[in-house]
Amino acid sequence: IMNYNPTDDWTNVFMYSDKTIPVLYSNLRELKKVTEDPIVLAIADIIKVAAMHRVTDAYGPIPYSMIGENGQIQVPYDSQEKVYDKFFEELDAAIKVLTEHRTDAISAKADYIYGGSAEKWCKLANSLKLRLAMRIVYANEAKAREMAESAVNSEVGVITSNADNARLTSFGADGNPIYVAVNYNKPADCLTGGDTHAAAD
């Protein structure tokens, strides 16, 4: 109550402090310059969707379908419905590639999450697809059902045990940016997360 006027610090967690969009798309652009490996590119798309769905869930309409064209970051915004449609399209393409290459792998040195396992990445993609389907259940029940059933009935399936959880092994000075969000405004000696709500400061 002492500070009634809200600060804008909390909005920086996804868009400014961690530079989600610029860093993500510049890395994708550089990746496509050095490899044509379909497994690597499919994994990159899964990571992109995993990151960007949190952005649209936080802010609603975002630049997405046209972003990265000719290296552009500042492009027209898409409706959240269009963004989610694109998510499903990209996940389906990644799932198709990884299902076809499920017994293959990439170098473990290039994969800090699954050690190069294409099959585990495919399970993550299906699980992410299921999560996104549940997100839209009140907006488009028919599509939510279609996407959810498709994910669960996939040849590879979804994550069903902790052994297949996606865990990022931190390296260097950088960790998972979601850790920053969860611990934002966290009081000393607090055993739970912080508070990222507007005016939480």
Task: Indicate where each model-derived feature is located.
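Structured, solvent-exposed acidic/aromatic patches
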Residues: 2-47, 51-201
